[in-house]
Regions:
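Active-site pocket-lining segments that scaffold enzyme catalytic pockets across diverse folds
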Residues: 48-63, 67-69
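Alpha-amylase-like alpha-glycosidases and glucanotransferases acting on alpha-linked glucans and related
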Residues: 1-55, 77-208
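Ligand-binding beta-strand-loop-alpha-helix segment within the catalytic cores
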Residues: 73
């Protein structure tokens, strides 16, 4: 990403890269990783540094006997042109975006520009993507806030290029997802906090 942005600031993410680089498995991507191994390693090192610093903050909070310590946040989605969609295009529905339906405060609804996970793929993979997501975000913290927790029940999908009022709800396997969340919460000794602002269905309130 850094290399493409240096060449052209308009290459905001992999959908705007030259076609040969849009497929993570392409020979061109493999060649780039080989030829620019030091550059790739540098950015991996930066990620490792950030992880170590975060972990050190968590250990300090535990040493100081803070009841919760660090409180992390799990976003409702990922960037359209980010690494998640580039690495696993099957998991995300790139022809849709999530958002919120029209309501009193927002008559036109909201389009957040985030591609949703495909619930059928999540189930087909035995929930592995959801489990890995929770495990990665429950490390080094005492609490995890789930942004738009209604997403485990349903998400407002908007066809790509349409406005939010043309969307529809897509259902997710809520009971399975909440059970997995409870299990990982126990395993990681991590409190879960669900953010339930906006249009909140009565079903999710009872299940939470």
């Amino acid at each position: 990403h850094a290399g493409h942005v240096q060449q052209d600031p308009l290459r905001w993410g992999w959908p705007a890269w030259p076609k040969a680089y849009q497929d993570i498995s392409s020979p061109e991507v493999t060649a780039f990783c080989t030829e620019q191994a030091d550059e790739v390693s540098f950015y991996l090192w930066l990620q490792w540094l950030a992880y170590c610093q975060f972990a050190e903050c968590w250990h300090t909070s535990q040493h100081d006997a803070m009841p919760i310590g660090l409180y992390r946040d799990l976003a409702v989605g990922v960037a359209e042109g980010g690494s998640e969609t580039w690495c696993d295009r099957e998991l995300y529905c790139l022809k849709a975006s999530v958002g919120a339906p029209p309501d009193i405060l927002g008559p036109l609804g909201q389009n957040w520009g985030l591609p949703p996970m495909d619930p059928h793929i999540i189930v087909a993979r035995a929930y592995e993507p959801f489990i890995e997501l929770l495990r990665a975000n429950m490390q080094n913290c005492g609490a995890l806030r789930i942004d738009h927790v209604m997403s485990v029940l349903r998400l407002w999908w908007i066809p790509y290029g349409e406005t939010a009022d043309h969307g529809a709800y897509v259902q997710y396997p809520v009971d399975d997802l909440l059970s997995i969340m409870a299990l990982e919460s126990q395993r990681h000794r991590c409190m879960v906090i669900g953010e339930d602002l906006g249009t909140v269905p009565v079903e999710i309130v009872g299940k939470l």
